[in-house]
Amino acid sequence: MDTPTLEKIVVAALEDIKARDIEVIDTSKNTPLFDRIVIASAESGRQTRALAQNVHDKVKEAGGEIIGTEGQDTGEWVLVDLGSIVVHVMQPAVRAHYKLEELWNTPLASRRAATR
């Protein structure tokens, strides 16, 4: 599945369960490992796990491949590896602490809010 199609599926799956502050970062020029990072916030461990599960389910339904999922035990930060896209679903305090957007050192102009 191509990256733009996969991105749309991921964003729609996150929006379905009311993820907040969904952000897509193009990492294709920063690393050969994946093309995009999608970061979203959830209000609770239960919502974090539900969002990650919905991404997993929707990608699988569309014929996509799930490489792996990490962090579902605590639900503070759940990562879903889809190969060309890595999805991070985080509770707000964890997101503020790790600042992945800054870690990838992308200026605000090259980041964009996710759209379906």
Label the predicted regions:
Residues 1-29, 43-53, 57-62, 69-72, ...:
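Long, contiguous binding/interaction regions
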Residues 80-82:
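Active-site beta-strand termini and strand-to-loop segments that position acidic
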